[in-house]
Each structure stands twice: as C-alpha cells, then as structure tokens.
C-alpha cells in the first residue's frame, strides 16, 4: 500500500513530529511505501515564542517539505504533489485548529482514503470558532483515529454525529528509546518534569508542592527539563520566592533525543501535574525508560497509568495532593516494583498494533 503522511516530520521538533516518524517507520517495516508531505514552515514566529522550531533530527524515509499552513499558495502545490504520488491512504496529523483551513482544502480534494490522526480535539488554548474549524477539516476524513477515550468523548461532544461517528479509538504506543539506560542510584531523591512547558502542564502546581515535599524529604531534587512556551521568568520567580534554589535544577531548553536517556536514567519518577490533558507523549517516553509516573488524573492520562502499579494519579491543580503522592512514593518504596511492572507491560500497545488498527 502507498501511504502518505501530511504534517510535521524532521527536522521539525516536538511530539507530533516524533509520533509521525515512529508510525511511518513502522509502516515502512511492514513493507508499505511511505511518503512524508512535510511542512516547509510550521508556524509564524508570533505563534511559537519558545524559540527554534527545528532540531538536528532527520529521517531516511522519503520526505518533501511543501506545506506552509498560513500561506494559501502552498496548499494547491501540496495537493498536486499528493495527487501526483497517488497514495492509497493519507494520514493527516492533527492537534490545532490553526491547521484547519489548509487541511480542509487538501483533504476534501484528494482522491484517496483519508485518516485524521487526532492528538487533540479540544485545543489546550482557546481558539475562536473551534467547532466550525474542526467540522471543516474533519468532514472529508473517512476515519478519525484518537489516542484516548477522553479524546473520543471530546469528538462526540464537539462535532455532529455524521462526523463524530467516524471516530476510532487508538492509543499512544510506547516509544523505543535510543538507548535504555538503567536507573542510576543518586545521592539524593530525584524528580523529573520533562517536555515543552506551557501553562496547562502545571509546572507552577509542582513548584507549589515542593515546599511540602521538602519538609518530608529535605534532600529532594527536582529537575525541570524543557523549553518554555514564552518566558521562563514566572517559574524562576516562583523558585526564588519559595526558596527552592537548592532543590530545583532548571534546564529551560529543548533537549535532543541523545540527552533524554541521561535525564531519565538519573530520575526516580517523572511528574506530570497537568491541569488539562488528552494524552501525553511524555508518558510514552517515561514508560520507554521504565520510569514511574505521578500524574494528574485528567483527560486520558489515567488510561496510560496503572494506578499504584506503574504510577500514581492525583487530583489536578492540587499541590498538597501532589506532594502527598510524591512523599508516599518514597515512604512506601514504590520505585523498584513500579519499574518492574512497567518492564512487564512494555510489549503491549505497540506501534505495529496501531499501524494494523489504522489499516483495518
């Protein structure tokens, strides 16, 4: 089968690009013919205040950089390129209404089957006319694959039945790490907050929980690893005001894959104090390194964490509850049993299974 992908791929960084690459690679292993119709430019600078949109990643799969979603003249060129390649299936990566006009134009004109792979239905930030934009982009899809039950419910709540009934429940597979570094025992307990930092991810909640955690575990260390969408000043000020400098280590930058393993190897547990969520690539990354997770029980996060076996779930936006879970994690010595549980479950929900679901 000839399978085309529409959306970001290397050298664009981020979870959407990474997900598409893993899935495309799996299709290639299954002997399908792949073509990536990549973005030439993804966002104008005003919509991406966290700096460079690129990293050093690359792909051996065939890829052409054509689409600039905010430049209409690129839409017809991308459409023609897809049609000339004559795919049997087009998989479009979706996560923001920003792409609705360009995607809608292309998807309603291609002559192959269309699957929208929806990482979100309701965006984390408010967008004017979200329902109208979603309807326009999604109405040409033969199927809409979502990655959590929460996302499927959002689809049914947001769009009319003639579109939402095309929804199919998929899942976010566990990533294959570049290298699985076993946990390295540290001189102090180590928490990890990882990934692109936006307000909805609740880093402020974690920082407010840290003084409570420190009372019980004086030598606790939190590593914050990821670029900030906007300014890091708000978090730096909180760290100073809460007198956390001795307990918090900040790496406010994008971390390439080659460094990721090191941060997980020296961390006891990954913290996801999200205020809202659908699912999270950070969970898939943490599980790939057999790192337990403490996360807010919001959206689809609970679907990927086996409470008290691979991690702990806490109420969202609740620093005392988050602190209590971290303290319990250490007091009850949960790390090693959770690592063993994660290792035993890593062979489920694979990329091969997701690829088969999409083909079927």
Indicate residue ranges for each PLM-predicted region.
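N-terminal strand-loop element at the rim of the active site
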Residues: 7-13, 24-84, 151, 166, ...
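Donor nucleotide-sugar binding/catalytic pocket of nucleotide-sugar-dependent glycosyltransferases
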Residues: 139-179
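Nucleotide-activated donor-binding/catalytic signature segment of Leloir-type glycosyltransferases, i.e.
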Residues: 235-258
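Conserved donor-binding/catalytic core segment of Leloir-type glycosyltransferases
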Residues: 184-201, 207-210, 223-225
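Conserved acidic donor-binding segment of nucleotide-sugar-dependent glycosyltransferases
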Residues: 307-308, 312-319, 328-333
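A conserved mid-protein helix/loop that constitutes part of the nucleotide-sugar donor-binding site
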Residues: 17-22, 198-212, 284, 320
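Acidic donor-binding loop of glycosyltransferase active sites
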Residues: 262-278, 291
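A short, well-ordered alpha-helix in the C-terminal region of glycosyltransferases
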Residues: 219, 334-348
């Amino acid at each position: 089968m000839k399978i085309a992908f529409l959306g970001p791929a290397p050298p664009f960084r981020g979870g959407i690009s990474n997900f598409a690459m893993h899935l495309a690679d799996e299709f290639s292993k299954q002997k399908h013919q792949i073509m990536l119709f990549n973005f030439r430019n993804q966002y104008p600078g005003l919509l991406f205040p966290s700096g460079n949109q690129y990293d050093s990643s690359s792909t051996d799969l065939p890829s052409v950089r054509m689409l600039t979603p905010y430049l209409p003249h690129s839409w017809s060129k991308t459409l023609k390129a897809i049609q000339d390649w004559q795919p049997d299936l087009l998989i479009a990566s979706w996560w923001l209404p920003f792409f609705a006009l360009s995607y809608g134009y292309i998807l309603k004109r291609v002559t192959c089957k269309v699957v929208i792979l929806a990482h979100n239905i309701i965006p984390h930030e408010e967008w004017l006319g979200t329902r109208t934009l979603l309807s326009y982009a999604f109405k040409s899809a033969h199927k809409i694959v979502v990655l959590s039950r929460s996302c499927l419910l959002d689809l049914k709540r947001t769009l009319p039945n003639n579109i939402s009934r095309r929804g199919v429940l998929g899942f976010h597979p566990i990533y294959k790490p570049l290298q699985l570094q076993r946990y390295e025992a540290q001189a102090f307990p180590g928490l990890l907050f990882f990934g692109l930092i936006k307000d909805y991810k609740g880093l402020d909640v974690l920082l407010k929980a840290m003084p409570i955690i420190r009372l019980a575990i004086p030598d606790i260390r939190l590593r914050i690893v990821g670029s900030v969408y906007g300014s890091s000043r708000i978090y730096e000020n909180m760290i100073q005001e809460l007198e956390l400098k001795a307990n918090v280590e900040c790496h406010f930058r994008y971390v390439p894959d080659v460094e990721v393993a090191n941060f997980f190897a020296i961390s006891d547990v990954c913290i996801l104090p999200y205020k809202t969520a659908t699912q999270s690539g950070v969970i898939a990354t943490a599980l790939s390194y057999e790192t337990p997770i403490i996360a807010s029980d919001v959206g689809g996060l609970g679907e990927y964490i086996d409470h008290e076996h691979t991690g702990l779930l806490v109420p969202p936006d609740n620093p005392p509850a988050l602190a209590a879970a971290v303290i319990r994690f250490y007091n009850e010595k949960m790390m090693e049993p959770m690592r063993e549980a994660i290792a035993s479950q890593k062979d489920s929900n694979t990329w091969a299974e997701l690829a088969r679901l999409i083909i079927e």
